[in-house]
Amino acid sequence: MSENINEIAGVEPSFKMDELKFNEKGLIPAIVQDHYSKKVLMMAWMNKESLEISLREKKTCFYSRSRQELWRKGETSGNVQHISSIYADCDKDTLIVEVVKEGPACHTGAESCFFEPVYQNEEITPFSYEGLYDLIMGRKTNPKEGSLSLIHI
C-alpha cells in the first residue's frame, strides 16, 4: 500500500504509508499524547487499516491484539480522541498521536494509563508554576549574585 498518508488525511502530500515500519504482525506502536498538556495518555497498536481510519475520521482507531479487531477509542465509552497531529519517530517504527480528548484515556477512568509509578527520582522535582514562583520569590528575598531574576524584581 503506497497510498500517500496526507492524501488520506486530505492535506498536502509528503509521506507514504510504505515508509512506516510495521512489525512482523503488521502493527506499529502509537503513543497517544494530550495536544495541550503534552502528557502521555496511553499506548496502543495500529495496523495500516486503523491508521487509515484514524486519518480519514481524524479520531483514534487502534488494533486490539487481544480481540484481534479494530476499535475506535470512545466508541462505547464516549471518550473520543480527536487527532491534531501524528508524528513518526526517526526510525519510522513508532508513532506519536497528539489528540484533543473528550474524557479520560484509561479504561479505569484515569486521565492517563500511566499512573503506576515504577521509579521516581526524589532529587528531581516535577515542574510547576508554583515552584517557579517560589524560586523567583526566594531570589527576591535572598538575592543570588549573577541571577537574571534580580534584573526585573
Predicted ranges, named:
Residues 1-11:
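Short, compositionally biased leader-like segments
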Residues 9-17, 27, 41, 46-147:
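C-terminal binding/interaction regions
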Residues 23-25:
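Short, flexible loop/turn motifs enriched in small residues
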Residues 32-35:
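Short, acidic, Ser/Thr-enriched surface-loop or helix-capping motifs
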Residues 38:
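Carbohydrate-associated surface elements
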Residues 151-153:
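Conserved small/polar residues in nucleotide/adenosyl-binding loops
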